[in-house]
Curated annotation (Swiss-Prot):
<dbReference type="GO" id="GO:0006071">
    <property type="term" value="P:glycerol metabolic process"/>
</dbReference>
<feature type="transmembrane region" description="Helical">
    <location>
        <begin position="37"/>
        <end position="57"/>
    </location>
</feature>
<keyword id="KW-0256">Endoplasmic reticulum</keyword>
<keyword id="KW-0443">Lipid metabolism</keyword>
<keyword id="KW-0012">Acyltransferase</keyword>
<keyword id="KW-0551">Lipid droplet</keyword>
<comment type="similarity">
    <text>Belongs to the diacylglycerol acyltransferase family.</text>
</comment>
<dbReference type="GO" id="GO:0005811">
    <property type="term" value="C:lipid droplet"/>
</dbReference>
<dbReference type="GO" id="GO:0005789">
    <property type="term" value="C:endoplasmic reticulum membrane"/>
</dbReference>
<dbReference type="InterPro" id="IPR007130">
    <property type="entry name" value="DAGAT"/>
</dbReference>
<dbReference type="Pfam" id="PF03982">
    <property type="entry name" value="DAGAT"/>
</dbReference>
<keyword id="KW-0319">Glycerol metabolism</keyword>
<protein>
    <recommendedName>
        <fullName>Diacylglycerol O-acyltransferase 2D</fullName>
        <ecNumber>2.3.1.20</ecNumber>
    </recommendedName>
</protein>
<keyword id="KW-0808">Transferase</keyword>
<dbReference type="GO" id="GO:0019432">
    <property type="term" value="P:triglyceride biosynthetic process"/>
</dbReference>
<feature type="transmembrane region" description="Helical">
    <location>
        <begin position="58"/>
        <end position="78"/>
    </location>
</feature>
<comment type="function">
    <text>Involved in triacylglycerol (TAG) synthesis. Catalyzes the acylation of the sn-3 hydroxy group of sn-1,2-diacylglycerol using acyl-CoA. Can use oleoyl-CoA and linoleoyl-CoA as substrates. May play a role in TAG biosynthesis in different tissues in responses to environmental and hormonal cues.</text>
</comment>
Length: 329
């Protein structure tokens, strides 16, 4: 079973792309704030509407509000919408400039536009918003077809489901994952998912990876390279609080979402303008294996975890976090 970093045979083509340098000239603060509110404000907007309906409106108007929200839960989404594509490009451009986000690719030549890759992105944080640097609408990576696998809860949330679908997100089901890889899409996922958000700690980065091997198995079955990715600074763009305990964990698992109280500037959903550095490691080539054994999956999983840890250690000082610790749980 071969599993090693791959390149095109030449010297590694290290590349640094700054969101501010790429989009700074075409951005202004108002547009950036508007983009961030559209992208990240839907959760707070839904909560505000529900609170308004429950506590302040008469029954008839409350029912109207809930009917309105339900309508947006089931309204069909046109993934090829021209408006959706334009809005997505607007959000991606201004998001990369807002923080700003810098993308550091260790070997750009190692990525073939005609191949599909499995990106294992860490950490989850409150929201894994640094992923926008890898989106196809941003255009930083040389990959024409990219999808982000996200919790299915997103796709039952009014307004959010439309926006995030247009941004390239899709439900994180095994069937979806396999189908997308087979059709030539590169897939970005956060292996730790809901449980990683539950394990978050202030001042330390947590990657819930030890028990997460399903994404490795799928990559092996389809013969797609695994790519470690780490985002520095993402955990600082929101302040947050969450309850603890086994009951809360069971609830989070049941709804496939970790309900966290989080806030940004002036208590709003607008995140703090804290620089983020998204570091993309070299792909780990994996031989196609339709029926990998548990031991074979464990071996490749170990290589991925080791590559992620190494990526973190080599870049943390450069990203401005020399004393930061990454815990694999």
């Amino acid at each position: 079973m071969a599993a090693e970093p791959v390149s095109d045979g030449g010297a590694a083509a290290e590349k640094l792309i700054s969101g501010r340098e790429e989009f700074g000239d075409s951005s202004n603060l108002f547009s950036a704030i508007l983009a961030m509110v559209l992208w990240l404000g839907a959760i707070h907007f839904n909560i505000a509407l529900i609170l308004l309906a429950v506590f302040f409106l008469p029954l008839s108007k409350s029912l109207l509000v809930f009917g309105f929200l339900f309508g947006f839960m089931v309204l069909p989404i046109n993934e090829k919408s021209r408006f959706g594509r334009r809005l997505s490009r607007f959000i991606c451009k201004h998001a990369c400039n807002y923080f700003p986000i810098t993308l550091h690719v260790e070997d750009m030549k190692a990525f073939d536009p005609n191949r599909a890759y499995v990106f294992g992105y860490e950490p989850h944080s409150v929201l894994p918003i640094g992923i926008v640097a890898l989106a196809d609408h941003t255009g930083f990576m040389p990959l024409p077809k990219v999808k982000v696998l996200a919790s299915s809860t997103v796709f039952y949330t009014p307004f959010l489901r439309h926006l995030w679908t247009w941004l390239g997100l899709t439900p994180a089901t095994k069937k979806n994952f396999i189908s997308l890889l087979a059709s030539g899409h590169s897939c970005i996922l956060i292996p730790g998912g809901v449980q990683e958000a539950f394990h978050m700690q202030h001042g330390t980065e947590i990657a819930f990876l030890k028990a997460r091997r399903g994404f490795v198995r799928v990559a092996m079955v389809k013969g797609k390279p695994l790519v470690p990715v780490f985002c520095f600074g993402q955990s600082n763009v929101y302040k947050w609080w969450k309850p603890g305990g086994k009951l809360f964990l069971k609830f989070a698992r049941a709804i496939k979402f970790t309900p966290i109280c989080f806030w940004g500037i002036f208590g709003s959903p607008l995140p703090f303008r804290h620089p983020m550095h998204v570091v993309v490691g070299r792909p780990i080539e994996v031989d196609k294996n339709r029926e990998p054994t548990t031991e074979e999956v464990a071996k490749i999983h170990g290589l991925f975890v080791e590559a992620l840890q190494d990526l973190f250690e080599r870049h943390k000082a450069r990203a401005g976090y020399p004393n930061l610790e990454l815990r694999i749980v």
